[in-house]
């Protein structure tokens, strides 16, 4: 049911010409769950990823997976990469966060930035002086797309649980009481209406 809703959601986003959608299908913390919970879910994800290229072709949407894919089973990673390679370009973008943790993303970005600076010959205070928010942002998993404007959290939870910690600094949040499989078109429309009625200040 949740995967069917995922396909529907892509259609809803397409109707409103939303250029970037990021969906969190599996957190890094989820990976600590027992195999009898994870294995069936992995199978569902593989089935979804097999369908994704067709869906994304219909909506002219590029696919990119973000997260610690090295922690995931080989067959799941293979299905993800096949989907990504099948539709790498498009006027819209679908990010799928899998094995994802917001803190880990920031750590990975910091490591990548420092490694890049060292390779360029920087060290000591000179290296430190090169580290700033713009430089770090350029090394986030989805650095090539804008930060999100709206984050929709389902399941009645009022927390981010580590989702897009860096990118969501100025995003607007909408918390929805229903679980994801029960998320309806009307819930989506209400979230957009709520967002449209807000006055965004971007921290000012």
Regions found by a protein language model. Name each.
Residues 1-204:
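Flexible, compositionally biased loop and terminal segments
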